[in-house]
Amino acid sequence: MNIKEFFCIFLPLLFLILFGKVYLSSFLLIYPGDIIFAFAISILTFRNSGVLLYIFIFFLGLLEGLDFLENEFIFGIYFVLIGIIWNHLKKYFSFESFELKISFWFFSILSFLIFRYVLLFYKLDVPVDWRLILNLAVKSFYYVCITFVWVLIFYKILNSFLSKTYEKV
């Protein structure tokens, strides 16, 4: 990721994403899934390393942590670790096929969901009931589906923007 891509593509998309998340959750009262995490995963699909990339991913983790029990720093570190793991796995697997990308996205979403629930149950001070677990299971299915749809949307948007930038060069 270079400065031009950051200011021309990623930063404006981040502002649109934050506006869309606020609009969907505040005005329409719809939980839009995890838009910020989906954006981070789709960025990691196209860019593998760089200091600016990891700073931006850490910042996205801080933004995500504001939504969930004030664990900003933990989520920032988790987002950077996902980036490091993705970069490390690119050495061993060829992520040229769309099926491998989908499997990594799905695995990342599920691992992030498990990470969120571990933090939730660690900070929870009430007894765990079967209705709570059933409610979390239903919300988890919705969460995975909607977040996966957002990943596909951001993948398509970033693919169109980044392929156009390389055609101009």
Task: Enumerate the predicted regions with their spans.
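Terminal, non-globular segments
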Residues: M1-V169
